[in-house]
Amino acid sequence: MKRLLWKSSLRHLQRHPLQLALAILGVALGVAVVVGIDVANGSALRAFELSTDTIAGKATHQIVGLDGVIPEGLYQQLRIDLGLRRVAPVVEGHAKLLRPDSPTFSIMGIDPFAEARFRNFTSSGPQGSLDLGIFLTLPGASLLAAEAASSLGIAPGDEFEIDIGGAVRTLVLVGHLPATDDAQLAAIRDLLVVDIATAQETLGLVGSLTRIDLIRPPAMTEAEFEESVAAILPPT
C-alpha cells in the first residue's frame, strides 16, 4: 500500500514539476524565516544583556525603592555605619535632546569617586581624557558616546538643551564616554552621564537616589552581607 502511495505521489510530482519546486521553495523560506527570527532574537537579547551589564557594572547587589526613589542618607549610612567602601549612588531618568531626530536618552547621575570599582564612565579612553575637575564643577557638565554626540552635531564644549517631561534644561558636553569595542559602543549610544548633583537637580530628585549599587566584600558571606544591609534599610 505504501509503495503504491509513493509511486502515485511521484507520478503526480513528475507531471507537475512547478508545484514541486514551489513546495521546496516554501519549505526553504519557512526554515530561513525561523532561523532569521532566532538570530534576531539572539542578537537583541545579547544587546540587552550588554546594555544592562554596562549600566550595572560590577555590582553584585542593588538597593532600589518601592516607589522608585530612596533617601540619599542611606548611602552615607552604608559607608559610615557599615563601613562599606564598594558602594555607588545612582540617579536615573530619561530625556530627549532638543535636536532633530534625537532618540530618548537615559540620564545617569554618578559619583565619579565611587564609580571606579563599578564602571569606567569617567576613565580616559581613546576618544580623549576627561578633566574630572570640570566634570564635577562646571554646571550642567555631561558625557555622551562620541558617535552619539557626532550624529547630533555636538562637540566638547558645546551647550545643548534637553526636555524632561516638558521642562527644558541646559547641559554642556565636556567629554566622551569611553568604549573599547563596537558592542560596548552600542550599549552606551543612548546614555547621557552627569554628576549626581546635576542629575538630582535636573530630574527633580534633590535629596534622593534611584538606586545604590554594591559589591559584596570578599570577607563576608552572601547571607552576612545581605543581613547587615537589610538591618539599616528603612521599613517598607
Listing of model-derived features with the role each one plays in the protein:
Residues 1-236:
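Alpha-helical transmembrane segments of bacterial inner-membrane membrane proteins
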